[in-house]
């Protein structure tokens, strides 16, 4: 049933394509090593408006022969991910291989171009690192951080739902990652368990920036994402394509949906019919089970607010009583605890 409710929304009036509807097969074994290359300094991503001709700053920096290709880690609609080892120093990474013909046929060249541009310019311990990329006549390859414990969604399927302690720690890390992105004027626009990976130490890694966008003016009108996680303003755009513009608060709504799904085990607005799911979203029609604590329920209700500007801010999420209860120890702040927990795991 879980796979059946995770539909990727498509619309002829929006820049959305079908994507995977079931968990990827991800490995749980080898530990990542430290990357020996020199990282680029973090910079504001520039807006992308050109078709996909991926230009490398130094085309000779990377090539397929540099890597020993290992077992498959996952397969999506348009790409495959493999465990790979850099031949010179043994550095383990994930190599995402995209085929140009498939990208062109699906008309998502700009999406991939934007993903590369944005993800290569962000540096945060809770965001999956893109070390570099290269291409040949047939393929575009992304060199990604290897998240050894795989997909959050796979773990959620296995456990059914998470404890509130685990959920709160994941949500706190997500809030820190989103705060970092929003300060750089980046909207992720596709937050869901399938797009969150888990590192070797249990820290989360926000991934899949295919629908993300750099938007300094903070107003957009393109519908994209996954139906269960769409905000009310995006649903309104589906019905009246030119009537609404939205900003980064759509990520706050998605964070609320994620919080609910982690502690309950399914999205809050699920219905067997998509039209009813849309209706429930536009009315914020949800029922929080009695086993959910009052603190968790309060945070969910403060994020899943119909009026975008009334949703809890990321700062309010980070200092919410539910987060403090499960993340704070020895009177330190939640930020200090989680910063210490991730500082030793981030790559230099």
Predicted regions, residues:
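Activation segment signature within eukaryotic-like protein kinase domains
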Residues: 170-171
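Intrinsically disordered, low-complexity regulatory segments that flank or precede the catalytic domain
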Residues: 1-62
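Conserved short submotifs of the Hanks-type protein kinase catalytic core
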Residues: 138-151, 155
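Activation-segment/catalytic-loop signature of the eukaryotic protein kinase fold
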Residues: 133
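Conserved N-lobe beta3->alphaC-helix segment of eukaryotic protein kinase catalytic domains
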Residues: 97-122
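Conserved N-lobe ATP-binding subsite of Hanks-type protein kinase domains
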Residues: 80
